[in-house]
């Protein structure tokens, strides 16, 4: 993994906060709750010596040590911690583009591989219409049951999206998937794109 980028502004801000803490040898720990899922959250916390985990990875910085949670480490690839001054004082931001991306390979369970391609390839395209699709279940020897939401629910083009977009992409990427089925109630057209 390449080191997490801590901008100079973020470093100085965090060093200032650490200087106000009681005690010595306090660092910052970065971790992700529920890494590789849509609910992933990237977090920073003070890290006293007794709070370090044996498998944490140390990244030495000018004024303190950044402790990287080992489980979160692959999901923190290309992460950037920055600080920007504003009228309210300032804001610390963490950008971790891989936090919600599942780490999969060809031996991963079928459901994980389906969710991976839904999140990384299919939903970004559907988002342009305010829609998304999620996996509900896998039935009958490899048939994925999907549910559309947002602008896709009730959309008149959903059959074409399902067959020519979603199913085609998933079958190309996952050879052991046999097909897809839509479990969405499309009678609700309140937010439909078409």
Curated annotation (Swiss-Prot):
It comes from the Bacteria. Binds 1 [4Fe-4S] cluster per subunit. The cluster is presumably bound at the interface of two monomers. Pfam families: Fe-S_biosyn (PF01521), NifU (PF01106). [4Fe-4S] cluster binds at residues 152, 155. Its cofactor is [4Fe-4S] cluster. Belongs to the NfuA family. This is Fe/S biogenesis protein NfuA.
